[in-house]
Amino acid sequence: MFSPVLFRFSKPNSFLVLLFFLSYIHFLPCAQSQREPCDTLFRCGDLTAGFPFWGVARPQPCGHPSLGLHCQKQTNSTSLIISSLMYRVLEVNTTTSTLKLVRQDFSGPFCSASFSGATLTPELFELLPDYKTLSAYYLCNPSLHYPAKFICPNKGVGSIHQDDLYHNHCGGIFNITVPIGYAPEEGALNVTNLESVLKKGFEVKLSIDERPCQECKTNGGICAYHVATPVCCKTNSSSEVNCTPMMPSGSSAHAGLSKKGKIGIGFASGFLGATLIGGCLLCIFIRRRKKLATQYTNKGLSTTTPYSSNYTMSNTPTSTTISGSNHSLVPSISNLGNGSVYSGIQVFSYEELEEATENFSKELGDGGFGTVYYGTLKDGRAVAVKRLFERSLKRVEQFKNEIDILKSLKHPNLVILYGCTTRHSRELLLVYEYISNGTLAEHLHGNQAQSRPICWPARLQIAIETASALSYLHASGIIHRDVKTTNILLDSNYQVKVADFGLSRLFPMDQTHISTAPQGTPGYVDPEYYQCYRLNEKSDVYSFGVVLSELISSKEAVDITRHRHDINLANMAISKIQNDAVHELADLSLGFARDPSVKKMMSSVAELAFRCLQQERDVRPSMDEIVEVLRVIQKDGISDSKDVVVEIDVNGGDDVGLLKHGVPPPLSPETDKTTASSSNTTASSF
């Protein structure tokens, strides 16, 4: 079986290695029968797997957190999630420590795949040399020539290539893994052949040393995991289980000790004994403090906590024990540290995140409520850690609010919340998946706008994915309340991840609005919400209209260097669109003047932005309607780009004919100028 050691060591003095591991030894009483589930193999159809995997009859502590296997009983197929993508496990070879995998979305037609990134976790998997990685581009400029060209509905023109050559001409890119001998065609891609190749899958080798677990089992132990640390659990004569971290291969405490090494061990043992005595005294002190705190609480002096009371706290100030029981080694191993779970998310200690972020040294950015840092967890996951500015009652409420909202939401375009700290932590920290490509704002008018500009097809796809996420939130009774381009993150494939739910509100389904003091970012705040203190989902629609205007123009929402009437982009957009001057708003580098299909799509999106930015919220479209309209615009644009014909517009007109493409433009300049001019369309300059 596979046996992991995730931490690789050089060859230090043996007594230092022993000291390191002695300091992590824990005595964990548990029944003999609790070992049995980790003796059980994962079985699904013809596939079996043991340590370091878990799943079905093997509880999570029996394997690495990232190696959970799922059995589809209807098809007897096994699946594994890697970097948020679902893979089918075709084979597990325990002799060579290899797996054969195929992406779940490649089981059907290629054009129906998710077109999202496929990055293997390097700490766990190594691609075998018989395979290679190719780049698949999509939403490409249709007027250029590409090798291995393909066209997919809603994804436009695409190409398969081994090098990163077309990122400036295409809206999206993702990786595919193929045999080393596969070569895509020079002309049109043979999609049927590619589908056949992808369905056969590829092989990876686990980047794990199996020898420590073999040694553990030879000595009568059971291999398990605490978070991402492999442990060996043994039963003593009193039927109690001791779990200790497994030592790396080649660093045995008994191999080749010199006289100085033995003296060092004696010194280390004495030091460890003194440390244990000090620890006992510290525990007594902490118990006394907790007892006093309980007395204060009983007198009505309790403090606000960031969580509801459906779980209980353990005796240690940085770990959480969830009420209820788990079978197998779960209760025992969870006591080793802070791997507990609150409402489906992991609870971290402050020290664990301090280590993951290298003492909060890698700042990614900051917002109105906290600074965000880059970090790497022990299991290899890259994370973004939000550190709230202060621990006031308001910050605690925002902390709790973001957890309550994100813990129950699952959507491909919403950022994933991995976990948080406890109320006992020195600081309130939230842990999210790390999104590598920055914010949409950086790509539109920030430091990446010149080096890697986003082409129009990709911008339209970003608008669709953002609208889809907001539509999902509204259907779930949630108003984001801070929709802006700095809260729209992009991964390496330019897939959207909407973030920052500190201001979001749960919206009662039986009410038309809720009354609350206006909050948000200048330039994005709904003027009716600002004036009347009445919040509903149409407030997000207004903010999204500003985002659409940024996608069209590449301009910031507020810019005091512009003419005073155009400082607020919402005002500028309304004025330009109403006066039939979209060309003065549009970023001409996107092809508005030279590509008829791009001009048509950008003009249609401008019409939609115009509707979203109306002063009267009742005439704004819903997010559901916005998603539908954007998809129609994209579909029509792709249809037009399949047969590009360059025409010279001798009249210089900008008429696009929106109605025949299903985009109802109320108050639009062409369909009803009289109505538009009589309406109050002046957006707030807030």
From Swiss-Prot:
The modification Phosphothreonine is found at residues 516, 521. Residues 1-33 form the signal peptide. Glycans are attached at residues 76, 93, 175, 190, 236. The chain crosses the membrane at residues 265-285. GO terms for molecular function: ATP binding; polysaccharide binding; protein serine kinase activity; protein serine/threonine kinase activity. The modification Phosphotyrosine is found at residues 432, 529. Residues 286-686 are cytoplasmic. It is a single-pass type I membrane protein. Residues 358-633 form the Protein kinase domain. The modification Phosphoserine is found at residue 515. The active site is at residue 482. Residues 657-686 are annotated as: Disordered. This is LEAF RUST 10 DISEASE-RESISTANCE LOCUS RECEPTOR-LIKE PROTEIN KINASE-like 1.3. It comes from Arabidopsis thaliana.
